[in-house]
A protein has these predicted regions:
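Membrane-helix and juxtamembrane interface regions of eukaryotic multi-pass membrane proteins
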Residues: 1-168, 182-285
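Alpha-helical transmembrane segments and their membrane-interface exit regions
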Residues: 168-179
């Protein structure tokens, strides 16, 4: 194998593709989605109600749970790797200890990379064909770029850092599943006020901590090291490293774009005023 193609030769063998984790993620998302749709329809929930983009409300709620529940999987395995729980000690053993960029972890590939790859493919399909509210360029870009990053890691590239970028950061999406529901079902927050407020607090806190504070603290040194690899000609594949840098920059931009909106939401919850209202008040003082 020539070094310059090593980063793209991922060996997508039947053993990898047909792992139980990969099959599980492939099956669980549509099963949850259509199972919940059937359940809601049987109970007559949200009959005839649609979003402003024309998506049936029950489809939106089914989507939120079908894609929110798998985030518990990613979060759990990220925590296990971080803390070394349940024999998930790959971060503290070879080969990841001595090679954080090209050491391969079967645990990471099985439990994070393959499932996330499938998750993002499904997310792209649902966004394009089923959920009109998600037909936005930034959503397509996020799903496709994230799936591509998983693909690059299948043969041992950046497996070490997956515990954070694929695992821990998904904690915020677990809370987001509940936070998003009142956008389509306004009465939810009134019927379940404690659950909604707790989820809001958990989402805002985890997003700011994980995606706006810790993300750049980890991403910046990674990008620096990858640039040094390109400079020193030690990258296995210059094209892969370059593409990964661009993908990371794009995803980082999205974290801060969304993070600013979330920080505004947090400010309004705490103060009861939007940032614009606070600025107007200060000007009047």
């Amino acid at each position: 194998m020539k070094p310059w193609i090593a980063g793209l030769d991922h060996g997508l063998s039947t053993v990898d593709i047909y792992s139980k984790e990969c099959i599980g993620m492939f099956c669980i998302i549509p099963t949850l989605y259509y199972g919940l749709l059937a359940f809601y329809k049987t109970l007559g929930w949200w009959d005839g109600r649609r979003t402003k983009y024309g998506t049936p409300i029950r489809n939106m709620v089914a989507y939120e749970f079908a894609f929110g529940i798998p985030c518990c999987w990613f979060s759990y395995h990220g925590i296990c790797l971080w803390l070394g729980w349940n024999e998930a000690t790959d971060l503290y053993t070879e080969p990841l200890v001595s090679d954080r960029y090209y050491g391969q972890s079967d645990y990471v590939v099985r439990n994070l990379l393959w499932p996330m790859f499938i998750y993002q493919i499904w997310n792209t399909i649902y966004s394009v064909f089923l959920i009109k509210d998600l037909c936005r360029a930034e959503m397509y870009g996020h799903h496709i770029v994230t799936a591509f990053v998983q693909y690059l890691g299948l043969n041992g590239f950046m497996n070490y850092h997956a515990y954070f970028f694929i695992g821990l950061v998904e904690i915020s999406n677990v809370f987001l599943t509940i936070v998003d529901i009142p956008r389509f079902v306004p009465e939810f927050s009134g019927n379940w006020p404690i659950l909604h407020k707790t989820s809001q607090l958990g989402f805002i806190t985890s997003f700011i901590l994980l995606r706006m504070i810790l993300w750049p603290c980890i991403a910046v040194p990674v990008i620096r090291d990858l640039i040094f690899m390109l400079r020193d000609s030690t990258a296995h594949s210059e094209s892969v490293v370059s593409l990964f840098i661009l993908a990371t920059l794009a995803l980082t931009y999205l974290q801060f774009k969304w993070g600013w909106k979330i920080a505004q939401m947090g400010w309004q919850i705490v103060t009861g005023k939007s940032i614009e209202q606070a600025k107007d008040h200060d000007k009047k003082q």
